[in-house]
């Protein structure tokens, strides 16, 4: 059962300028292994985080580092959660994430589907 969906689009050049103007932003938004990525990839990962927050109904007090993206051996993105995001994920019964990322025309877009098994929600 689909619990929530989220989509977000990020202007890559604008995001890169924000990272340059605010050096601590990289540390606030990303876990250590994400911080080393190119701005294009960081913009896409931030879009995933925003889309996941929308799919979970933006948990109050969400800490951006409590969700991160990794890629499997085929390059497919996977969303991981801990802390504030994982608590909201459990409360909503989400046990599977579906993530799609694309880049084109200077933009990065992410679409996230939060899925739960029937009857697994806490409400």
Swiss-Prot record:
Parts of the chain that traverse the membrane: none
What are the alphabetically sorted keywords of the record? Cytoplasm, Fatty acid biosynthesis, Fatty acid metabolism, Lipid biosynthesis, Lipid metabolism, Magnesium, Metal-binding, Transferase
Q: Which cofactor does it need?
A: Mg(2+)
* Pfam families in UniProt: ACPS
Record: residues binding Mg(2+):
8, 50
Catalytic activity entry: apo-[ACP] + CoA = holo-[ACP] + adenosine 3',5'-bisphosphate + H(+)
EC numbers on record: 2.7.8.7
Gene Ontology terms describing biological process: fatty acid biosynthetic process
Concerning its family, UniProt says: Belongs to the P-Pant transferase superfamily. AcpS family.
What HAMAP family would the database entry show?
Answer: AcpS
Return the protein name.
Holo-[acyl-carrier-protein] synthase
Biological source species: Kocuria rhizophila (strain ATCC 9341 / DSM 348 / NBRC 103217 / DC2201)
